[in-house]
């Protein structure tokens, strides 16, 4: 059932979708890791693919940048395409000096400066968290792959350029890294009764000033991708 943002047919998406922000990263994941990937969506250049990984159907589709964008795509996948699990595989800026470029973190929770959750009229501050089963599948996968993956709080910012200098205030509260989508994804999963997890690779470090190139961000975050794919396999076995 196509939507204004997705021209895939019902049944074109697997139960688990890996969701990078970048359409080129979605293409890279599909062509590098999936067997017989099929392009199922290309509206607005937001490419979506479905194939298999180790015999398990898996889809990958870009979310675009920011909470409003991932809010649209995740909601439609959950409600129109019967997707059960969305694993965000994106980049993040480290708020700890010990997080090296290319290292992987998982967001157990995601605080935000966004008003996205206001739509639910909860009357308070909602704390978006990931799905525990998805998180454990990712943690086990990371251990099996020999990849160190700290688990903690992410900060989903509505702004990329931090004009007011507020990002580092979150670092003082133990937040590991800043990105722009996880909180919206977690809220949408909670509202629809589905599962979500954000796994992020460190593209730059706000403490040290180090950063990766745009090309490296598209194609070198393979540990994050493998963890997401292995987690998808584990979820299919449960």
Roles of regions detected by a PLM:
Residues 125-173:
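Active-site rim beta-loop-alpha module in soluble metabolic enzymes
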Residues 183-216:
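Zn-dependent metallopeptidase/amidohydrolase metal-coordination segment
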Residues 206-238:
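His/Asp/Glu-rich mid-to-C-terminal helical/loop segments that flank catalytic regions of hydrolases
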Residues 35-42, 146-153, 235-238:
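Flexible, glycine/charged-enriched surface loops at secondary-structure junctions
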Residues 62, 91, 108-110, 138, ...:
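Short, structured patches in soluble enzyme cores that scaffold and shape functional sites
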Residues 137-145, 188, 227-235:
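Generic non-transmembrane alpha-helical segments
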Residues 1-128, 132-133:
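Metabolite-binding pocket within alpha/beta catalytic cores that recognizes anionic/polar moieties
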């Amino acid at each position: 059932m196509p939507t204004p943002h997705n021209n895939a047919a019902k049944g074109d998406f697997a139960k688990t979708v890996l969701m990078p922000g970048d359409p080129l990263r979605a293409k890279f994941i599909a062509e590098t890791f999936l067997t017989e990937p099929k392009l199922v969506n290309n509206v607005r250049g937001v490419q979506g693919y479905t194939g298999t990984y180790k015999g398990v159907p898996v889809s990958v589709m870009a979310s675009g940048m920011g909470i409003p964008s991932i809010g649209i795509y995740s909601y439609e996948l959950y409600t129109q395409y019967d997707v059960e699990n969305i694993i965000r595989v994106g980049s993040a800026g480290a708020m700890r000096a010990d997080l090296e470029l290319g290292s992987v973190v998982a967001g157990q929770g995601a605080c935000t400066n966004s008003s996205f959750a206001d739509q639910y009229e909860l009357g308070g501050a909602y704390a978006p968290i990931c799905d525990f089963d998805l998180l454990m599948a990712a943690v086990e996968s990371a251990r099996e792959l020999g990849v160190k993956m700290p688990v903690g709080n992410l900060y989903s910012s509505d702004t990329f350029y931090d004009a007011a200098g507020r990002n580092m205030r979150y670092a003082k509260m133990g937040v590991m890294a800043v990105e722009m989508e996880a909180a919206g994804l977690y809220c949408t999963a909670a509202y629809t009764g589905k599962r979500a997890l954000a796994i992020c690779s460190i593209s730059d470090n706000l403490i040290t000033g180090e950063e990766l190139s745009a090309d490296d961000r598209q194609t070198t975050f393979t540990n994050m991708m493998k963890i997401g794919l292995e987690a998808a396999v584990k979820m299919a076995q449960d």
